[in-house]
Amino acid sequence: MKLSFSLVFNALTLLLQVCIFAQARFSNETDMQALLEFKSQVSENNKREVLASWNHSSPFCNWIGVTCGRRRERVISLNLGGFKLTGVISPSIGNLSFLRLLNLADNSFGSTIPQKVGRLFRLQYLNMSYNLLEGRIPSSLSNCSRLSTVDLSSNHLGHGVPSELGSLSKLAILDLSKNNLTGNFPASLGNLTSLQKLDFAYNQMRGEIPDEVARLTQMVFFQIALNSFSGGFPPALYNISSLESLSLADNSFSGNLRADFGYLLPNLRRLLLGTNQFTGAIPKTLANISSLERFDISSNYLSGSIPLSFGKLRNLWWLGIRNNSLGNNSSSGLEFIGAVANCTQLEYLDVGYNRLGGELPASIANLSTTLTSLFLGQNLISGTIPHDIGNLVSLQELSLETNMLSGELPVSFGKLLNLQVVDLYSNAISGEIPSYFGNMTRLQKLHLNSNSFHGRIPQSLGRCRYLLDLWMDTNRLNGTIPQEILQIPSLAYIDLSNNFLTGHFPEEVGKLELLVGLGASYNKLSGKMPQAIGGCLSMEFLFMQGNSFDGAIPDISRLVSLKNVDFSNNNLSGRIPRYLASLPSLRNLNLSMNKFEGRVPTTGVFRNATAVSVFGNTNICGGVREMQLKPCIVQASPRKRKPLSVRKKVVSGICIGIASLLLIIIVASLCWFMKRKKKNNASDGNPSDSTTLGMFHEKVSYEELHSATSRFSSTNLIGSGNFGNVFKGLLGPENKLVAVKVLNLLKHGATKSFMAECETFKGIRHRNLVKLITVCSSLDSEGNDFRALVYEFMPKGSLDMWLQLEDLERVNDHSRSLTPAEKLNIAIDVASALEYLHVHCHDPVAHCDIKPSNILLDDDLTAHVSDFGLAQLLYKYDRESFLNQFSSAGVRGTIGYAAPEYGMGGQPSIQGDVYSFGILLLEMFSGKKPTDESFAGDYNLHSYTKSILSGCTSSGGSNAIDEGLRLVLQVGIKCSEEYPRDRMRTDEAVRELISIRSKFFSSKTTITESPRDAPQSSPQEWMLNTDMHTM
């Protein structure tokens, strides 16, 4: 019996082992089959053929990329990262039930992530980054409860982040960056209390960050940059004191940062908040974050000063505060430089595009010797470049452009031998260009344009063999162009325009095969244009106008990339080459004011009369009809003729004599006309239309505008200005209602007014700026120059029409006047337009002529600022041009609206616009014009309103409307202060007026009902009552 039991036990044990072995073999077969199915949908783009080992000749646990467990010999790791595999991820991968690590990163897998990945309940590490995956993130991943790392970054995944991921309680790293994810930030992710890294950057997510994020107390790295998140700075983040890296850049966050920011997040090493809408001041408590290494809050709306406490951040190596409103134009705006000199690790400092004023301090030379990038451009910095600037021996990028720097470059500047980029343009730096620039052999960009440099161009620049950009235009350089600079093989752009250079243009230019743009216009160059220029095969822009070049146009037929060419105002002769019509990219061609002869082509660019200018060439003919050139005479073939009689010979001689005399008179008249024309052009300083007008894709002809305005009929005349008349017209096949401003070119400065409007509208667009539809630069029916600008028509006329009682009959709806709320809306529109021009344009613009007649209203009474004929691009400012080109009724100001400093020769500025806006605001809400006869001497609209308000208290008004009007007038007073430094900024004015509107003018009755339906005191009545009460 005992023996029988032992036999049975052994038999059962053996049977169990056989079953286990069979089960293991079956499971192993399942893993192998899953791997082979995965391989079947994959191909390789490399020579290694790593999957070649995946076959039956060897155990699958020995296959490349496969790791098995020792006990069960099941696949626990599939690591194929970086093998350059293509194809799709097979759903069979979900059968590897013992898998703990799955790494398919850095391949080219496409299609979607299989839902069956959710079967891998033992999975701890999942990395499918840097592939071509698309579709949704599978919600089934929530079944993989042991996951600690999920990296799906750098794919094309879309839709939202699955809220189910919030159940992965062990997740430490979640990286979904660089995809196409949309939707909101899931509140359920607040359950991931083990999360240390979250990266959602480079997606399209939106909404606010939920408060549940505050529970992520283990978080070290939080990055959601380059999305569309909004709201204030997420309050939840203030609770995560463990944060070391925080990036919210390139979103739409707004509001102020808390003053105790640095106390709440003391462990930060990286803080990136750039390109949002944050306002207020930079928290001084940031100095408490002693570990801070990189801080960037560029491109926001911050104001105030740059904290001196930054000097305590000894680990700081990157400080970016570019493009804000810091400094307030104060002379103390640069004091922080002395403080950050204590940041001995500093490598990058960018405070450009702010309002930093005062002289450039000598302490700049005490900045860290590790500093490689220094950006102070686009501010209001004056003084000279300090003599010890050469101490910054590691400097690679130096940006001081568009300030008010003067004096000569110091000798020590030549010690900066590591410089690669030098931006000094648009200052008042003088002296000769130092030869030591030739020792900076790493230079790539040298921008010295728009200064007061004189003397010769140094030959030593030829040693800068890596130079890409060489900008020296708009200085006082003389002498010849050194051939050495035209032997720099890397040159892409060279601009020597607007100087006093003489001699021939060197033939060495033909060696610049990479040259894209060449400008040598408005110099004193002579001789023939270099024939070798035809070898610059990459050329797109060629400007040689305003010189004394003669002879024929060189052969540029191989320059197939040419877009803009200007050879005007020279002495070029011969025929216009036909191959110009065959250049496929040519969009603008100016050959005017030369001595060309013969037939003008009619194909290619010559088909468009508005893209080609040939006026001032007296011996040309043909061309398209719109050019209005004389027809070409076809010469008859010679034939045998009978001898003339004596009488016929006498008659013929007399006719020939008379014809010769007439010809002499005509030629003399044309020469006089050309000379006068050239003189007028020179006095106007007219640059090439082709470059400025290149932004308008479709220009209209004179004939089209002539027809659209019924031959510029007086019945269509809707306004007159300093430089011309404005007509109403119906343009194009759709009869679009437009306003056509025709310039009177006989009036001095009119051409510059035309160019100023074109230049200003290049690249700007705002709902409160009048829309410039197109332009016309052509000849009229009599062959005279014709310039016109075509705007969107504003049916409600100008604000001036509404403000003047004598013009009310011209308003469409003359039975009513503007309500206080409507006036406030208009004021906000104007202020918003100015804020855009002053702050948000790439090149800030000063309008220089804000007044009621330049504020146009559409059907909804939305205001549009118009008439940019006097506008100044502040970063291209030319003081002499400002002082001389316009009359006192021009840019120096319309009397009553112009800033006081303009009357003393001050330069155009955004502060001048603020003054004009303040006067406009006072006029709108006081009922008095700034030119009222009661004003004399120092007693003006500003002082009048100020004296009225000083006699009333904040509760002096009879109702909320009156209180609102009082606050509006206070804004007008702050904007129209005598001294620019005391005036309110446009962005402050916008915020203040919006706040007043929301508090005092937000009711439905106030905004929408007319005075007949909802009686209320007008601003004029309120001022009158207050005046009588207080005077």
Curated annotation (Swiss-Prot):
Its main location: membrane. One of its GO terms (molecular function) is protein serine kinase activity. One of its GO terms (biological process) is response to molecule of bacterial origin. Keywords: ATP-binding, Cell membrane, Glycoprotein, Kinase, Leucine-rich repeat, Membrane, Nucleotide-binding, Phosphoprotein, Plant defense, Receptor, Repeat, Serine/threonine-protein kinase, Signal, Transferase, Transmembrane, Transmembrane helix, Ubl conjugation. The modification Phosphothreonine is found at residue 709. PANTHER family: LEUCINE RICH REPEAT FAMILY PROTEIN, EXPRESSED, LRR RECEPTOR-LIKE SERINE_THREONINE-PROTEIN KINASE EFR. This is LRR receptor-like serine/threonine-protein kinase EFR. The lineage of its organism: Eukaryota, Viridiplantae, Streptophyta, Embryophyta, Tracheophyta.
